[in-house]
Curated annotation (Swiss-Prot):
Keyword set includes Endoplasmic reticulum: no
Binding-site residues for ATP, renumbered to this chain: 542-611
Protein's recorded name: Carnosine synthase 1
PROSITE patterns named among the record's database cross-references: ATP_GRASP
SUPFAM superfamilies: Glutathione synthetase ATP-binding domain-like
Keywords linked to the UniProt accession: ATP-binding, Ligase, Magnesium, Manganese, Metal-binding, Nucleotide-binding
A single BP term in Gene Ontology: carnosine biosynthetic process
Residues engaged in binding Mn(2+) 2: 689, 691
Annotated binding of Mg(2+) 2, by residue: 689, 691
Superkingdom of origin organism: Eukaryota
GO molecular function annotation: ATP binding; ATP hydrolysis activity; carnosine synthase activity; homocarnosine synthase activity; metal ion binding
InterPro entries xrefs: ATP-grasp, BL00235/CARNS1_N, CARNS1
Residues in ATP-grasp domain copies: 516-720
Organism, as annotated: Mus musculus
């Protein structure tokens, strides 16, 4: 991230083929580094901006220059002069917010002269009265009638004063605020008539109620000084999915007989400000916090809805979107209820106030605040939009199309502007119609991957595909992808590392031999195991691996064929059964049988199971997301339930993240998005297996929902040799708890059209999250989950409660499938 202190450090250059648009180049800027280091850098040649946010308010001092720089850029832009003027138009915003549910605004009478088109149409609230003027002179009778009706209306509530002000871009921060007693309408009329003479087109004169400060009983009797008023500043940000999220709230406290303004009061937290005014009762404070959250988020929702209907010219550019908003509120009593009322919107003052409060903890020897910075969600949005901009138009080759659970790949690729070329064995795969180029090629025989990589490279060259990257999200095709990348000179982890991670026994045995340095060595996380290819191997393994153990396919996925074995006879029986039932790809497509049906026996370790999804670039850990798994239905290991984020203690969470990361590095996995399965035992994390690709099932969807980070976008960026810019310490915005549905347990539910319609309806309504993992309802001994049903909540307990209720209502919970037991780990 770069800070430009002068417009002269930036330059716009017209973009060929994109009429009216320009790229933004940075020739000089302040750069920031960990540890508080800053440098003044000169860039030769200039750098291309991938996101631009300018200070456009009157307080910025360089508003005109910044406005011109922000207009019609090809890169994502956080605001523009055009949008800023709309936000600062007090009447327009008040009219907009008055129509938003859950947002209260002061009672307002507006005299408008040739109002803007955005103000025409729609219904305002009873507390907002718009009077259109045909001219600026000869309006005395109309003004007198309207003012007298307004000051006597019930909409003003307990307000004893009204303010009269001009509204329009010219008047931002340039006028005093005259206050008048409500019982003296003649002075209000005279003030309005005097201001009407100054109006130009699309401007207005506002008469608005001054919300009376809350009179709170102070302990020990009345306060010796004047009554106090609280001014609230809320910062709300646009996050993934164009949803508003309240980031932080700070307050100013001042005299109740005059307006409390920015820069004239010291910022403090809401709870401290309320305590100063005598409000400390927890339930009341929590209720008020929720009201502020709803009002602030409702304000941004209204702005985003308005913005969606604007033309490119009205927004100031194709890439302009409002990414954050400052909301000024005041506390008042409406109908005996303490209510936050939105006074105005701004583009920077509230964020500045939050920064001033956060700056308190930067002083040496003072404890630091554990709260997230107010700008953190904004920075996440900047990074996400910047990444999307970098990937727009990139050409990627995808090896293996996967099944219905990977439908999101093709939808997201279109949204991100990616051009995809697909290599797939099935000539009739639905994804063949969703890509730029489809190459039909049999990739199921993985023992010929090296030969196939050479053949595919020739096909790519023959078609003259100009690739920026190549990747796969399908287990079976990972080694082939690495070999092809090496042949084409594209970024990827080495094929040897992919082979090592793909074969489960090789992974464990290799890590067991890694004794360090560095310390702790990866051998501490590996588990004793033995590869099995024939019956003699089974006999040897029984004596080498402590029992009970886990027997599984070397190259398997989805927990198909994985079973707990307690003694020698069970080992022999399960090995023989798998050898007979699962001989090749045709017996169970998509679980790795194209690599053969070799097995392994590994030690069974007690503990809680966890998934760690990592983003690694150049051998550096960029992000990690930990989820918890519920108990499985032994002796099988098919997943039952999951919870995100993890319920592990912070130290244990750090241990599983570091264990997963070190195991990946130990295998040579230096670049990519990886999924690592571990158990947290009494002795620390132990490795189950490494999946050298993006996490499957619901994981990408959940991480995107909770953290705003898209593992698919990160995967494609790494595949193109670009480092994803991800938040260093992402915080989850709630919890998700999910349960798997199996054909063997839920066939009646899943085959019923009405039940499936109910699931889809609940998903569309936001009552649950439905992730379809399989397309066909195929019963069998070796099954994979058909779908995942999840519920969100502010805590694991609340999410579990909602999910259990839905499972009981729909029939997912049953005697042979006790959902409450599967969720018991998450309390």
């Amino acid at each position: 991230m770069l800070l430009c202190l002068s417009p002269a450090w930036l330059m716009k250059v017209a973009t060929p083929g994109q009429e009216g648009e320009a790229v933004l180049l940075v020739s000089k800027a302040v750069s920031f580094y960990p540890g508080g280091l800053t440098f003044l850098d000169d860039f030769v040649p200039p750098r291309h901006a991938t996101y631009f946010l300018a200070g456009l308010g009157p307080e910025s001092g360089r508003g005109k220059e910044a406005a011109e720089l922000a207009r019609n850029l090809t890169c994502p832009t956080g605001t523009s002069s055009e949008l800023s003027q709309l936000l600062e138009n007090r009447l327009l915003m008040r009219w907009l917010l008055s129509q938003q549910s859950g947002v209260a605004v002061p009672a307002t009478l507006a005299f408008t002269y040739r109002p803007p088109g955005l103000l025409r149409g729609g219904d305002a609230s009873p507390g907002l009265r718009l009077v259109e003027l045909s001219g600026k002179e000869g309006q005395e009778t109309l003004v007198k009638e309207e003012v007298e009706a307004f000051v006597h209306s019930e909409a003003l509530g307990d307000a004893s004063q009204v303010a009269v002000r001009l509204s329009g871009c010219r008047w931002r921060g340039q006028q005093a605020l005259p206050l008048h007693l409500r019982v003296e309408p003649s002075t209000v009329v005279n003030t309005v008539l005097g201001l009407l003479e100054k109006l130009e087109e699309e401007e207005s004169v506002l008469v608005e109620a001054m919300c009376p400060p809350v009179r709170l009983p102070l302990p020990g009797g009345p306060a010796p000084g004047p009554e106090l008023a609280v001014r609230i500043c809320a910062v709300v940000c646009r996050i993934q999915g164009d949803r508003p999220l309240l980031s932080k709230v700070v307050c100013g406290v001042g005299r109740g007989d005059r307006p409390v303004r920015h820069h004239y009061t010291l910022p403090r937290t809401l709870r401290v400000a309320l305590a100063q005014c005598g409000l400390e009762e927890e339930a009341q404070v929590a209720l008020l916090e929720q009201g502020i959250k709803e009002a602030a988020e409702g304000a941004l929702a209204a702005v985003l809805a308005l913005e969606a209907g604007l033309s490119v010219e009205q927004r100031g550019g194709r890439q302009v979107h409002t990414d954050f908003l400052g909301v000024d509120l005041v506390l008042t009593v409406i109908g005996r209820t303490l209510t936050p009322v939105v006074l105005k919107l701004n583009s920077g003052l509230c964020l500045e106030a939050c920064g001033a409060l956060e700056g308190l903890w930067a002083v040496p020897r003072l404890r630091r605040s554990a709260e997230e910075a107010a700008a953190a969600p904004l920075v996440e949005t900047m990074l996400r939009r910047s990444g999307r901009h970098l990937m727009d138009g990139k050409q990627l080759l995808v090896i293996g199309a996967g099944g219905v659970s990977k439908k999101f790949v093709w939808e997201a690729a279109r949204d991100y502007g990616l051009t995809l070329h697909l290599v797939e064995s099935d000539p009739n795969h639905f994804a063949s119609q969703l890509v730029q180029t489809f190459i039909h090629f049999d990739v199921t025989e993985h023992r010929r991957d090296e030969e196939n990589a050479l053949l595919l490279a020739e096909l790519v060259r023959a078609r003259n595909l100009k690739l920026d990257g190549c990747f796969s999200f399908w287990d079976d095709c990972l080694v082939l992808t690495a070999l092809l990348c090496r042949e084409l000179g594209l970024p990827c982890s080495p094929p040897a590392a992919m082979c090592l991670a793909k074969q489960k026994s090789r992974t464990q045995l290799h890590l067991l031999r890694c004794q360090g340095p560095p310390w702790p060595s990866t051998s501490l996380h590996a588990v004793a195991c033995c590869p099995l290819e024939n019956e003699a191997d089974v006999e040897r393994a029984i004596y080498q691996v402590p029992l009970p153990g886990v027997m599984k396919l070397e190259f398997g996925s989805g927990a198909v064929g994985v079973q707990l074995v307690k003694d020698g006879p069970q080992c022999r029986e399960h090995f023989s059964r798998i050898l007979h039932d699962l001989q090749g790809e045709a017996d169970h497509p998509g679980i790795g049988l194209g690599w053969g049906n070799a097995m392994l026996l590994m030690e069974f370790v007690e503990g809680t199971e966890h998934d760690v999804d990592l983003v690694v670039f150049g051998g550096r850990l960029l992000a990690a997301f930990v989820s918890d798994n519920g108990p499985t239905r032994l002796p099988g290991f098919t997943e039952t339930a999951a919870c995100m984020p993890t319920g592990l203690a912070p130290e244990q969470e750090a241990q599983v993240v570091q264990a997963a990361f070190r195991c990946c590095l130990g295998c040579g996995l230096l670049d990519g998005v990886f999924n690592v399965e571990l158990k947290m035992t009494g002795a620390g994390p132990r490795l189950i297996e490494i999946n050298p690709r993006m996490g499957g099932f619901y994981l990408r969807d959940w991480i995107l929902e909770l953290y705003g980070v898209d593992l698919l976008l990160a995967s494609t960026m790494v595949a193109c040799g670009l480092q994803p810019a991800l938040p260093a310490h992402p915080r989850a915005r709630g919890y998700l708890v999910g349960i798997m549905c199996l054909v063997s347990q839920h066939l009646q539910l899943l085959s019923s059209p009405s039940s499936r319609e109910t699931l889809q309806t609940l998903h569309d309504q936001g009552q649950l999250r439905l992730n379809l993992l399989e397309e066909a309802l195929i019963p069998g001994q070796y099954e994979e989950p058909y779908c995942n049903v999840a519920c969100a909540g502010p805590s694991p307990a609340e999410a579990c409660h909602r999910l259990l209720g839905i499972c009981q209502g729909l029939g997912i919970d049953r005697p042979n499938y006790p959902v409450a037991h599967f969720l018991s780990h998450f309390k």
